[in-house]
Amino acid sequence: ISLSYQQATLADTKEVNVANSYNSSDTYLPEALSWTLETSPNYYKVLGESGIVENLFPPKGQIVYGGLDSLGRTLTVRGTLTFNNVLGSYNIRKDFKRSKAETLSGWLGNKNGEVYVIKGLGDDSYQGYFWNKSHLIADSLGGDALRVNAITGTRTQNVGGRSGNGGMRYTEIKSQKWLEAHRDGYLYYEAMPIYQGNELVPRAVVVSVLSSDNTINEKVIVYNVANGYTIDYNQGTFSANQ
């Protein structure tokens, strides 16, 4: 079950203010700009404990999308996820609508037939599309294919290298496995895009996860970069480094 942005704002003003102060993206911007392949070859880094504020989250089984800011950029998404969220996603792939209203900020798409090589360490290189419509809460965790639940992300931000278990997939896989093993439990799951100034494409996403038994309790930054390429985060364009 998902709640729309309008429904989410029924929370009282005090709670909304707490949410905004709790999640200041500027806090994480220096880290978002510090990525190197050598230190984070799978495009994520564990920052520490989740710091989850439980009263900011919806009832069990629900997801609240934070909507869009004045520039049309996706904001923080929070969900209190259960096994039923995962169960409802089995064998279902939701496609994003191709409409102007659902176009992600900074999204220019991929040219037909264009294939790019993003080199990793050793043999872990990716070959394929450069950009993905990257979910904040994955469809495998019950997230919807909506503009308010996605960003313009590099392929490596979405899944890491060729192995496909890095980037956003790191917390997604861990969370799905935990929910499948703890069918009576629940997870607080939060994904916050990190923007620099008025740029339309985020520099990173900070994902915070806390399980009801506290065996998962971590905050992870996922870098929206691609080794060997320079990205224009204002325009959503990129070029290969010489």
Question: What kind of region is each of these model predictions?
Answer:
Residues I1-E54:
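N-terminal, intrinsically disordered, polar/charged segments of Gram-positive cell-envelope systems
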Residues G51-I63:
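Early extracytoplasmic/domain-onset interaction patches
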Residues I63-S70, T74-Q242:
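Domain-level detector of nuclease and nuclease-like folds
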